[in-house]
């Protein structure tokens, strides 16, 4: 048994030795995905999809609470429609997959497989918005999109991925700005409260903003290896798309006005954040609030009379307060321990003959490995408390890591030294895109966001030494 368990654990490369390989090992061994037949595609397996489904359900509930309605738009976009907004199409052109034939017949116009759906929503709005009474339009779509990526990795960057994309139209710039901010706050709430991942909130630089946007807001998370991951974005389009697609309405005075639009999206990329923020060398660690199974009961010496019966009684008891499962298979307990540690199930519940005799169970935390003996009469209450403790600890641990990995640089020598240590660097910037490009060229770090809270760590730009305009968080990123 010991040898089998050891071999099971050895399938994971230590993150300290090779973080990229550790990530790949966890994704595979935790049974989250398999590789698709086309390069860059993935099969999200039942356990991986169950986690995504819990994330999706929470987010969908939040959307509906803020008045949004779900819709489903086509997968295909005519080339002529995609090209209507110049900046937008240029931003996506290298990644677009094209349909050129229908059966044996060559199409007269190429059809894009949607990389995103702005132009489809704009075309719809141009035909369905006529009066101020038609506003606002608050739509969200769950679906998949295709972006023909050159370098791929499961969840983080794939040629096809699942996501939601919200598209809204408003009468005024102020309403659109309010919507852009509200949806970023919605993402931040989801990621921090449910995924236990702390995020930075801020605005993208003009160089990094979404193609065709007036401005882009972002949440940025820090991974265990010190790299950043953009985890959700919200875009204010102003009237740019409305002018390109002639989306106008008559206001209360009978005057024609262009609508103000937003879009916002969060994808299965957030699964990558979940893995790389909380995972360890034993595998995945899933926060209780989104865990498909919050507690797994493992009977010990289950072949002995009465053990399985008591374990199933316990399951029925705990199922009233949490998502609970039981492994009644004939696999050895050690194998089961490793299996559910690998899958990151928040709490393991052990029950054997001695525990039954003492009317107790053993609760084992996935995040710390700590064990505690709990009377059966108190186990429901204690499990609920313990799940809350695990959730809070995962968030605090990730926040402490981010704080430890956030430093300040006042000149390029200091910047170059600190970027090698990983993490976020707070540095002043003059606002000139040439400095932003120089920093990327010299260090491979990119601007992650201009934070909401104004802060000054120096008077001059970290790159050129001229008068600084604002503070920027920089990092190497996925």
UniProtKB/Swiss-Prot annotation:
Keywords: Aminoacyl-tRNA synthetase, ATP-binding, Cytoplasm, Ligase, Nucleotide-binding, Protein biosynthesis. GO terms for molecular function: ATP binding; catalytic activity, acting on a protein; proline-tRNA ligase activity; transferase activity. It catalyses: tRNA(Pro) + L-proline + ATP = L-prolyl-tRNA(Pro) + AMP + diphosphate. GO terms for biological process: prolyl-tRNA aminoacylation. GO terms for cellular component: aminoacyl-tRNA synthetase multienzyme complex; cytoplasm. Its main location: cytoplasm. It comes from the Bacteria. Pfam families: HGTP_anticodon, ProRS-C_1, tRNA-synt_2b. Gene3D superfamilies: Anticodon-binding domain, Bira Bifunctional Protein, Domain 2, C-terminal domain of ProRS. Catalyzes the attachment of proline to tRNA(Pro) in a two-step reaction: proline is first activated by ATP to form Pro-AMP and then transferred to the acceptor end of tRNA(Pro). NCBIfam families: proS_fam_I (TIGR00408). This is Proline--tRNA ligase. It comes from Oceanobacillus iheyensis (strain DSM 14371 / CIP 107618 / JCM 11309 / KCTC 3954 / HTE831). The lineage of its organism: Bacteria, Bacillati, Bacillota, Bacilli, Bacillales. The gene is proS.
